Amino acid sequence: MAFLVRMLGRADYEPVWRAMQEFTGQRADDTADELWLVEHPPVYTLGMNGDPAHILDAGGVPVVRTDRGGQVTYHGPGQLVLYTLVDLQRRKLGVRRMVSALEQAVIGLLRQYGLEARARGDAPGVYVDGAKIASLGLRVRRGCCYHGVALNVCPELEAFDRIHPCGHAGLAVTRLTDLGVEAQVFEPAAALVRELMVQLGDEEIAA
């Protein structure tokens, strides 16, 4: 099985989210899985069971209650978002395995830059020296998942000061540029997709 990879450029969060819902709701048993790469304008998203109290001060940034798991996170310019529209049932993948594949894909990407990163069992995502560099959340519907992982390449980090990232007060957040990697937002995209392919033993079809 192969993935169809779509580069969406910069796009507002809500239309992309609605498109993921529509894709998942209409897909058939033989619909190809897709990966969407996108950068969003500033937005805070709150998971299904997320506590609004974790948003300290939105500061005029839109807040969207979405249907992924997890608490609150920030998306904005300089952050690379990889959405995974995957038929887990067809691939015989559990949710935990998919989460692990996303985490390990980011860890593998960071290793290419000479950075040692790890996942945490108590707080999904990827961390470098205790600071979070990638957040993730999924929704499963009809045996298929959507949403995905967000990697901080070169975003402004002040927006994270206005929330408890992923529901954890005082959680440190970092980005590639603070770790000595000068990159534009979409530069790591191809390598991140390849790392995910390694984790899932798959092939890529560029769209």
Swiss-Prot record:
Site (Lowers pKa of active site Cys): 132
Stored Gene3D superfamilies: Bira Bifunctional Protein, Domain 2 (3.30.930.10)
InterPro entries with a match to the protein in the record: aa-tRNA-synth_II/BPL/LPL (IPR045864), BPL_LPL_catalytic (IPR004143), Octanoyltransferase (IPR000544), Octanoyltransferase_CS (IPR020605)
Additional note from the record: In the reaction, the free carboxyl group of octanoic acid is attached via an amide linkage to the epsilon-amino group of a specific lysine residue of lipoyl domains of lipoate-dependent enzymes.
Predominant cellular place of this UniProt entry's protein: cytoplasm
Gene designation: lipB
Function, in words: Catalyzes the transfer of endogenously produced octanoic acid from octanoyl-acyl-carrier-protein onto the lipoyl domains of lipoate-dependent enzymes. Lipoyl-ACP can also act as a substrate although octanoyl-ACP is likely to be the physiological substrate.
Protein name listed in UniProt: Octanoyltransferase
